[in-house]
């Protein structure tokens, strides 16, 4: 979708740049309410995830990541805004009467038809196993475990590339730059996730950020020593340490935090680029 620039009529719209949001009238049988998760607190009320709280109430949309309506053609009826993700979603009416939401593929318009199965055309929005796709195909919503549903490349603008097939595995280049192996029997959707201009958005004011449930972030260097290892000192003092740390004293900014000898290390050919 296109990015809309506001006229500078007020200070809050001076730097605002938002996408042209499509209206959302979700179907009642495809939504359900969510219980608020304590605004970043645990069961004792202690903050465990900082900078969270507030925000507008949301209804969760049930998204079909499995695409298990095999060999049944569906038509895109609406393209809707989803408050739970950056990508848009589209409502599909299948030939057997089933109605489901899927992630909106880039370039798909109302009236287009999609289908999932083993021998379906390599067309944007169609879902099929990796073994039936030619090399170089751009894909998204990729399964890691067969039948579990898509888990990779689901964010707005995300796209992966099928670069090799050998034996029982397919080699994919993911949006992060990581190259890894996945079973050829796993399914994926052809094309790129829509709303590629989401990274060009500028909320323009603090209130828009609060609507998203995100609270202000304060630098540790301006805190007191009791609140952060970087705090204290006279005037604009440096952090007083060799390397920056988290509020709890652990290394920050570059320290690798992935668990060693993780089972999935055997499937990763090249680590993601920093």
Swiss-Prot record:
Q: Would you name any one GO CC term? A: chloroplast
Name the principal localization, coarsely classed. Answer: plastid
**Start and end residues of each stretch annotated as Disordered:** 1-22, 225-274
Which Pfam families is this protein grouped with?
A: Ribosomal_L2 (PF00181), Ribosomal_L2_C (PF03947)
Q: What InterPro entries does the record point to?
A: NA-bd_OB-fold, Rib_uL2_dom2, Ribosomal_uL2, Ribosomal_uL2_bac/org-type, Ribosomal_uL2_C, Ribosomal_uL2_CS, Ribosomal_uL2_dom3, Ribosomal_uL2_RNA-bd_dom
Tell me a GO biological process for this protein. Answer: mitochondrial translation
SUPFAM superfamilies documented for this protein: Nucleic acid-binding proteins, Translation proteins SH3-like domain
Q: What is this protein called?
A: Large ribosomal subunit protein uL2c
């Amino acid at each position: 979708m296109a990015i809309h620039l506001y006229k500078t009529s007020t200070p809050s719209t001076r730097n605002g740049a938002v996408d042209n949001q499509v209206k959302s009238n979700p179907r009642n049988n495809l939504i359900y309410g969510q219980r608020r998760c304590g605004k970043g607190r645990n069961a004792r009320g202690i903050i465990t995830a900082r900078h969270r709280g507030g925000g507008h109430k949301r209804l969760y949309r049930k998204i079909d990541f499995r695409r298990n309506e095999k060999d049944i053609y569906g038509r895109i009826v609406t393209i809707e805004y989803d408050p739970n993700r950056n990508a848009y979603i589209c409502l599909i009416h299948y030939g057997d009467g089933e109605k489901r939401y899927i992630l909106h593929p880039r370039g798909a318009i109302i009236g287009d038809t999609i289908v999932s199965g083993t021998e379906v055309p390599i067309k944007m929005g169609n879902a099929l196993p990796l073994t039936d796709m030619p090399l170089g195909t751009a894909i998204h919503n990729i399964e890691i475990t067969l039948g579990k549903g898509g888990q990779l490349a689901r964010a707005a603008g995300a796209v992966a590339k099928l670069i090799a097939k050998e034996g029982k595995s397919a080699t994919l280049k993911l949006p992060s730059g990581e190259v890894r192996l996945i079973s050829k029997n796993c399914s994926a959707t052809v094309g790129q996730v829509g709303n590629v201009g989401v990274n060009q958005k500028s909320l323009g004011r603090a209130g828009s950020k609060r609507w998203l449930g995100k609270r202000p972030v304060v630098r540790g260097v301006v805190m007191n020593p009791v609140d952060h290892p970087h705090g204290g000192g006279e005037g604009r003092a440096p952090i007083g340490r060799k390397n920056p740390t988290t509020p709890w004293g652990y290394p920050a900014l570059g320290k690798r935090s992935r668990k060693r000898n993780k089972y999935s290390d055997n499937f990763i050919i090249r680590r993601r680029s920093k």
